[in-house]
Amino acid sequence: KLIPILLVIICMLVAFNFETFKEGFFGMNAHGALPFNFGDTMSQVKSTMLVTVWVFIGIEGAVVFSSRAKRKKDVGTATVIGLISVLLIYFLLTVLAQGVIIQNHISQLNTPSMAHVLAYIVGDWGSTLVNIGLIISVLGAWLGWTLLAGELPFIVAKDGLFPKWFAKENENGAPVNALLITNILVQIFLISMLFTDSAYQFAFSLASSAILYPYMFSAFYQVKYTIEHKQHATPKQWTIGILASLYAVWLVYAAGFDYLLLTMLLYIPGLIVYSIVQKNNQTRLTRIDYIFFTIIIILSIVGLIRLCSGAINVF
């Protein structure tokens, strides 16, 4: 699937026109005029945060499968290589495209926009090539996310933090129950797309918002761990922890209050599962648990009321 992407990048480099790029990227044409009104830059950055997060969701996938790795060092290496590769590809595709087609035309291209860009440069066969690559990419993503979604509840169940039912394996070592439940949920989502064109946009916005809180608390834990081991902490650990925490808080803010409320609705089943697991482990809920339970329930009720009243428009 990388062949069409690399071909698009090479073709855009050849066809790149700096005047076209300057007009779209800086909002200026050759005479220094401002043909477009891009509005407030910070508002634009904020509005694209969920889409940006959605692009990089799953970059931690190597960590999920770390228990199956022969060398633990490969997990960190794979994560860094994956992050840099995805970042570089998206950067080149986004920036170079603005040097080929003017910005307001790019914003009106249908999905997949990369196919239209290549067709603009080399002809209709370019669009066909990109679409073939897209099919291969979707099949690969389908396989990868099927494994990732099934592995996560399986590992958590083995650690005693999820119902033991999810830890069941077949004769080949595959987490059958975890794969069954996660794929049923995927099918329900796919069916929902038949009834509204906005289902995918709503789903990736909600999923991006939901993943922000695990990311944020992971960053907080890095700071907490560094403080607890400050005698051996390095400047690198402090820098990563603090910057990641600040960025995570900004992401939660950028996602908006409405998606925070809707995310709380997703956590309600988690409260039930958590209570069952604690009971099975013969562990009593703590005061902190009850405080978080109360906050999540209150916010979810507010979100449900706003959703039913139309105050939150998801489609």
Regions found by a protein language model. Name each.
Residues 1-131:
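Helix-loop-helix junctions that connect adjacent transmembrane segments
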Residues 1-4, 68-72, 79-85, 142-180, ...:
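Helix-loop-helix connectors at the membrane interface of multi-pass transporters/channels
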Residues 3-10, 85-92, 129-136, 177, ...:
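Lipid-exposed faces of alpha-helical membrane segments in multi-pass integral membrane proteins
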Residues 9-19, 94-101, 152, 190-197, ...:
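Transmembrane helix-loop junctions and nearby membrane-interface residues
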Residues 35, 80-144, 162-207:
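TM-loop-TM module centered on a large, flexible mid-protein loop between adjacent transmembrane helices
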Residues 69-73, 197, 227-234, 279-288:
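Membrane-interface helix-boundary motifs at transmembrane edges
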Residues 129-130, 191-238, 253-268, 314-315:
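Transmembrane helix-loop boundary segments of multi-pass membrane transporters
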Residues 235-315:
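A generic transmembrane alpha-helix motif of multi-pass inner-membrane proteins
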